[in-house]
Amino acid sequence: MTQRSIAGPICNLKFVTLLVALSSELPFLGAGVQLQDNGYNGLLIAINPQVPENQNLISNIKEMITEASFYLFNATKRRVFFRNIKILIPATWKANNNSKIKQESYEKANVIVTDWYGAHGDDPYTLQYRGCGKEGKYIHFTPNFLLNDNLTAGYGSRGRVFVHEWAHLRWGVFDEYNNDKPFYINGQNQIKVTRCSSDITGIFVCEKGPCPQENCIISKLFKEGCTFIYNSTQNATASIMFMQSLSSVVEFCNASTHNQEAPNLQNQMCSLRSAWDVITDSADFHHSFPMNGTELPPPPTFSLVQAGDKVVCLVLDVSSKMAEADRLLQLQQAAEFYLMQIVEIHTFVGIASFDSKGEIRAQLHQINSNDDRKLLVSYLPTTVSAKTDISICSGLKKGFEVVEKLNGKAYGSVMILVTSGDDKLLGNCLPTVLSSGSTIHSIALGSSAAPNLEELSRLTGGLKFFVPDISNSNSMIDAFSRISSGTGDIFQQHIQLESTGENVKPHHQLKNTVTVDNTVGNDTMFLVTWQASGPPEIILFDPDGRKYYTNNFITNLTFRTASLWIPGTAKPGHWTYTLNNTHHSLQALKVTVTSRASNSAVPPATVEAFVERDSLHFPHPVMIYANVKQGFYPILNATVTATVEPETGDPVTLRLLDDGAGADVIKNDGIYSRYFFSFAANGRYSLKVHVNHSPSISTPAHSIPGSHAMYVPGYTANGNIQMNAPRKSVGRNEEERKWGFSRVSSGGSFSVLGVPAGPHPDVFPPCKIIDLEAVKVEEELTLSWTAPGEDFDQGQATSYEIRMSKSLQNIQDDFNNAILVNTSKRNPQQAGIREIFTFSPQISTNGPEHQPNGETHESHRIYVAIRAMDRNSLQSAVSNIAQAPLFIPPNSDPVPARDYLILKGVLTAMGLIGIICLIIVVTHHTLSRKKRADKKENGTKLL
């Protein structure tokens, strides 16, 4: 065993021990929302810089969370409440003695407050991109939702809405309503409303008012325009995930109240489990118990934090390791690019370096012009030292000294740490790092970088990157491109349009086209880098055919970069570049193109790449995601490709999909996903995503994705229908996309351990089928689903196993003993292809079916599930359970449900009351006429 392999585990053990010792600090330093003693600490709510200043927003947020805390406490049976909340005030608002931020930023917020950019909707929603029981990304409220009290009529009180969304975000449960399928036929052949619980009552309403249920039915389906209006007064106490606006609703659907037959997303995504079952299975509930007594918890405490000056320090490794594999050259090129193009104006920037000791190279300098940028570039290192040992802690110490010169503390500052060496004493400065209030972004170069380097980023909420020693990799520049101010102001941040590199032979060329769409174009820059002594021949064509040559670029021969800034707004369209290698040997030529938004009212299309977990153990796959959107609207049908670079070996490319199958949970939400499991060896992997958008194919969605709080159109109260104001349109105007667009984003890095050396047996099964659907046509049942692969969502599975039952509980609890459907003639197709399979279920489902409890009842529904098998007999998990009505004779109409019987009784009673009232009125009128006649007659007699 080598000295390094012995020292590594010892160092890691010391590092872990130190982390445990400092664990009390973690809830407040980069660890996100933590549950301690039944209370949530660290919830971060951030207001976007584009939101106009309004102090009522802050007071309403406080009221919302305070109400939500008590509502959540009771709904979870005295389990959890909100204790400490931070509200991040944008720097664009006036400073009111708010605390200075530490590691908080808009991009890390659990809740964001911002408009939808051009839309008029106010739906609160949570972006969920993972499966059942998994945390979401963020909750989104519009300022209007938080300020306009009229909206509470449709959504319910803001505190109740927040609890609905919190359950999405924290516990990964889904909505129990379905606007697309508001009605269904249950197992007793009754027409039911999609809801949870089934005890919630109301009446059917046609386009012109109340109507009998049968007027809503055409061919046993509900007529378009027929809806169900809920009673404002209910006895049902569930469910928060259905209609939190009802005053009686105070809990989540549990095993006794959950409606397993309703065609909603909760049933589909969570295999018919109740919301409460999923919630109680969460880590929060495994580590907490109900509070004793009857007292309520204390109300939440709020702290307002606000960003000040943006402060960045580059902390750069200059040890002898940086001389290997052109690492210093790559660092110089990327750092120059960052200083000249990426870092935002008015930012304070300093530079420190380190080998075995630290050194300050440049004190803080505010960027107000290009001259300021050039001055900072001049301080970048040009040589490496002869020292092989490094001290990352010494470098960080100098970095803190630099940033503390401004305000005496490092609060809110950013460190960009770049290193290729191992530091076994890295844990020594961990307390200083944790207490600094600084965010550390780490960039590891090559395979010898400190194995614990990423912990600095993880604990401070920073990003993690890896740059392999591959000559044509552009990962270093991609990493610096990904690092933004974190303010959430997309109009001030750069957008990466292109990033590519190739090893080009002598007298050969690198040629490609990049699209500048009409949402970007300001501050557009083309960057070319090379390895040889002189630049390649550069030819660039704009969309009008104008040519730019090498002499039009600003060249830095020391760093081997050539940059071209397009004045004003770059012309939209296709820009074509050609790089000719005029050198006598092969060299890596690379191109990077960035731009900024061209219109402050129109957000640019963006892509954010990330992984589900950044550290895992073989054979667990990596889930790769790319969120492609414009503003908050998803962009559909784009071509999204992930490139994964290992420490050793060739890069792997993978097409990401938004098809609602395999790794992709929700179809057409703009989040493209895929499993990655092609692990070459243990170590770090770098991720980058390319997006290409064809105007003839790709389209922006017309609605915001995510799990939305239900907007109730109206209620019935005392026999009267009271309609709410129509829900505002959440659609968007279609914009001309003549050229499409291209985008690039680094997804950071991830690491994998436990990868076997050499060939290993197949350990990857087909992925779970999550989109099984069943449709009954006459006497046949047609199933459809997306084909899984031989390995997860790639390749081709070997066989399918389809089973069915008339008992939901049977197929849910005992799939292996449900009725087997003959699929011998059905061979799986390639992963991603839509499968369709039709069969007749009658021969196996005649007569009543015995239930697990020994009872029997006649069921009019069939439940079906499926799993796939690969050639090595590895099985997927059982799919979601699909359901459909059995064959119903023509004279067997659906039985009116209780809601209709209630309505019929009400209408009958109202009719009887009306008849009685009519009799009374007629009798009264007759008697009155008779009295008047008698008086007239008596008067005549007196005269």
From Swiss-Prot:
Keywords: Autocatalytic cleavage, Calcium, Cell adhesion, Cell junction, Cell membrane, Chloride, Glycoprotein, Hydrolase, Ion transport, Membrane, Metal-binding, Metalloprotease, Protease, Secreted, Signal, Transmembrane, Transmembrane helix, Transport, Zinc. The active site is at E165. It comes from the Eukaryota. The keyword Glycoprotein applies. Residues 54-205 are annotated as: Metalloprotease domain. Plays a role in modulating chloride current across the plasma membrane in a calcium-dependent manner, and cell adhesion. Involved in basal cell adhesion and/or stratification of squamous epithelia. May act as a tumor suppressor in breast and colorectal cancer. Plays a key role for cell adhesion in the beginning stages of lung metastasis via the binding to ITGB4. Belongs to the CLCR family. This is Calcium-activated chloride channel regulator 2. It comes from Homo sapiens (Human). The lineage of its organism: Eukaryota, Metazoa, Chordata, Craniata, Vertebrata.
